[in-house]
Each structure stands twice: as structure tokens, then as C-alpha cells.
């Protein structure tokens, strides 16, 4: 029997998205990213220094952190204090890699940008929402530096966005929620640039296997969703006054 989406979306339809920019008064760039019932607070902090391996290089750096609040899921999760889980480390490395791909570090100069992504509510897709929202926080931070004259030209090369896709009952679906994520035989996280080049493809079969044709279908579906997200990102950045 064909899979019926719990929220009645079409297979190629994103969940409702909303970007509340300037969410934090203390950060140079911030956004509360809504993706369906998933909520991720993304903030950008700029520090006037770089890691030791970049000292006197004239180049900047970007790093990212990811955390999930204890109350973000139906059952409370313990805070990660002294040691991060393997999952958390993997996700924040993914976010950092994805956002570094969009920066010209020579234009940024010797500054470090820290992107903090905190999951307030999780209904699947937290890492992809963190990347998509993280780019908005980054874009707002760069916009501010340009406005105040700390940068003469933007170090942003291309926007970056991410989305999940999966196979359920052998059929491809875009932007899985939690119920769909747990039912999927195959699920992928796909990260792309504004010119639709791939930055990262994370995917696995939870049961069985999948064909090259199905892989191509999933990537095409991800591209469709990412094109929509890229437009929404740019609208959020352009319409924000700091």
C-alpha cells in the first residue's frame, strides 16, 4: 500500500518553512529556523582572532557547534556536558564543513566566525535545518560587517542549503518528518551550493538496498527542495534590517 504522508504533503513538497531573523539581540547574525515542527536557533559570533594554524596567514576561519536541548524531544535527553556524543560531533563537523564551503577566507581576513546551532524542538531534519539556518545567520553577520565598514567586499561565494530525502515503500519523498524518518528504508541528507553543486551527500539503506536509479531520483528531489530553500534564505537576508 502506498505511503500516505502524515501531514498530507505531496512527495516533492517541503514542510512549511519560516525564518525569524534577528532573534537574538546579542549576536551579529541570528535566526530561529522553522522546518515543520523542527525549530533550530542559529547564531553567528565573530571573533578577531584565528586558530594557531592560521596566524599571520591573512585568512579567517569558520567553526560550528550543535546541541539539542533536553526538552527538544518527547522524552527528555540529558545535557551533553563533559563529553559530546559521536552523533553531536558528526553533525557539528558537517555543519562546519558545509558553511566553510561558501566562504573566501582571504576576503574574510583574520577573523573566526562561530555558528552555534541549538535545537529547541526536534521533528527530524535538525542537521539540515541547522545548515540552512546557519547560512542565514552567517549571511546576516557578513551583511553587518559590510554595513559598518569592517569588510570592503563580501567573503560569501555562494549560498548553501540542505534537506533530507528518503525512500518509503520504495518511493522517494522530500523533507522527512520524524514519523517518515523512522519508516524510511533509505534516508539521505544532501547539502548543495547556490549553483546546485554538491557539498555533501550522507545516505544509507536502513534495510535492504537501493538502485542507482533511486539514488538519482533522491538527488533530483533534494535539488528541487534546495532550490526553494535558497530562495527563502535570500529573501530572509534581504528583508532583514539590523
Swiss-Prot record:
Phosphate binds at residues 87, 125-127. It comes from the Bacteria. GO terms for molecular function: 3'-5'-RNA exonuclease activity; tRNA binding; tRNA nucleotidyltransferase activity. Phosphorolytic 3'-5' exoribonuclease that plays an important role in tRNA 3'-end maturation. Removes nucleotide residues following the 3'-CCA terminus of tRNAs; can also add nucleotides to the ends of RNA molecules by using nucleoside diphosphates as substrates, but this may not be physiologically important. Probably plays a role in initiation of 16S rRNA degradation (leading to ribosome degradation) during starvation. Disulfide bonds: none annotated. Transmembrane segments: none annotated. InterPro entries: ExoRNase_PH_dom1 (IPR001247), ExoRNase_PH_dom2 (IPR015847), ExoRNase_PH_dom2_sf (IPR036345), PNPase/RNase_PH_dom_sf (IPR027408), Ribosomal_Su5_D2-typ_SF (IPR020568), RNase_PH (IPR050080), RNase_PH_bac-type (IPR002381). It comes from Gloeothece citriformis (strain PCC 7424). The keyword RNA-binding applies. This is Ribonuclease PH. Belongs to the RNase PH family. It catalyses: tRNA(n+1) + phosphate = tRNA(n) + a ribonucleoside 5'-diphosphate. Keywords: Nucleotidyltransferase, RNA-binding, rRNA processing, Transferase, tRNA processing, tRNA-binding. Homohexameric ring arranged as a trimer of dimers. GO terms for biological process: rRNA catabolic process; rRNA processing; tRNA processing. CDD domains: RNase_PH_bact. Its EC number is 2.7.7.56.
Amino acid at each position: 500500500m502506498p505511503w500516505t504522508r502524515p501531514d498530507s504533503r505531496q512527495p516533492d513538497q517541503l514542510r512549511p518553512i519560516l525564518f525569524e531573523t534577528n532573534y537574538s539581540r546579542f549576536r551579529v547574525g541570528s535566526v530561529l529556523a522553522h522546518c515543520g515542527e523542527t525549530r533550530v536557533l542559529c547564531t553567528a559570533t565573530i571573533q578577531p582572532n584565528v586558530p594557531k594554524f592560521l596566524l599571520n596567514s591573512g585568512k579567517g576561519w569558520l567553526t560550528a557547534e550543535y546541541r539539542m536541548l533536553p526538552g527538544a524531544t518527547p522524552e527528555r535527553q540529558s545535557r551533553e556536558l563533559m563529553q559530546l556524543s559521536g552523533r553531536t560531533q558528526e553533525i557539528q563537523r558537517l555543519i562546519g564543513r558545509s558553511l566553510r564551503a561558501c566562504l573566501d577566507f582571504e576576503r574574510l581576513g583574520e577573523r573566526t566566525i562561530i555558528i552555534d546551532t541549538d535545537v529547541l524542538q526536534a521533528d527530524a531534519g535538525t542537521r539540515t535545518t541547522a545548515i540552512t539556518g546557519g547560512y542565514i545567520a552567517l549571511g546576516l553577520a557578513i551583511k553587518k560587517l559590510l554595513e559598518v565598514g569592517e569588510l570592503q567586499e563580501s567573503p560569501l561565494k555562494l549560498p548553501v542549503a540542505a534537506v533530507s530525502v528518503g525512500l518509503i515503500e520504495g518511493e522517494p519523498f522530500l523533507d522527512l518528518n520524524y514519523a517518515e524518518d523512522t519508516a524510511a528504508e533509505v534516508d539521505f541528507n544532501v547539502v548543495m551550493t547556490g549553483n546546485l553543486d554538491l557539498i555533501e551527500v550522507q545516505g544509507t539503506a536502513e534495510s535492504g538496498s537501493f538502485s542507482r536509479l533511486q539514488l538519482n531520483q533522491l538527488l533530483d528531489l533534494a535539488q528541487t527542495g534546495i532550490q526553494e530553500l535558497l530562495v527563502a534564505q535570500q529573501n530572509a537576508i534581504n528583508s532583514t534590517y539590523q
